[in-house]
């Protein structure tokens, strides 16, 4: 007797046929086009809409960070691009989306086994949806970053092409792998170093180019070494101060403001703040696995502060918590970030998770090769506000994209493309995706064409944003 199955399990040929059929309906060449819709929303208006739920005193800081360049503007413009992607061609091959897969949302961090991994690291906008959305967000970010760094048009095109080509080629590999092999696939420190050395070996026949690649490799290795030192003890040296024999978080407004200085902001007394913090901490612990909860219970919550992070997230409520284990030399910093409605939910089916913190945690666990053991979620004092929790620094490292030359950014594009494909292969169908993407370069050429056109649009939007600041429509505080 064959048991009834609640989940469909098509065979390899059926999965491959699905991908090839999608080519007929949505040719790969169709992804090259970008033209703003006649009823395209005002990009500045979309940002103003986001600002209504953000901390009023931090909104000008967000604007100031976005004003730095078209690249930083793009980092904060996920809502604008979500609106633009709606209506673009999609093949009907859905995956768990990062939702904001620009090149600065990739980075290094420690796995639970203490191995340094490279992966996506921001999931605030995660939602199931068309794989093309993440690929286009990633690829366009490489074009915009390349222009920001002063690359020639040819170099910008080559870098962007590499990101999409790497995605396509990696998906071809994942299509041949077993299900568990895909799930366990990861890019660790050794893989990154090997990729850099492989690039250096290829450049060896060209002495001038070889020197450039060697410098890029040295910079990459140095960044990885630096990541190893970024832990809670290092964070304590930067964010903590010893007062009356006990550590607390330093005050550096508006970037870091301890809760002891924010009582009036939230309309609470000191005792009410203390009670609220511990209630939140208990609620968060309840979302952890039993063994992880027991581990966390060995730490005492010592202090909490509001801390500004990133570009696009500025103005959403974000806090850090200082915890102490066996003694003052055993700290743990946790980050608590507000999780709002995904920018994609205006255009895609709503998340099955009503709690947006849980939505973020699920997306992160689905897409990352390994995730923080302290990932959890809570509701705020205002039950309409949702939060997710994670470690603040756990060997976290990021690439200095704005300092990269073409060789370095091309290598980075290769790594990011592979990583995004691996993340998509975990939740999507790599066989169907590979069958759709094909063996030739048509897909990446189309994505590179789209990225060039969208980078032009981003520059126009940045100009409109800058004009809104100059006119007084938006307030911006720069340099913070």
Task: State the predicted function of each range.
Residues 1-10:
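General secondary-structure propensity
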Residues 10-11, 15-29, 35-98, 103-228, ...:
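Conserved ATP-binding subdomain of kinase catalytic cores across diverse folds
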Residues 190-276:
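Long, low-complexity segments enriched in small/aliphatic residues
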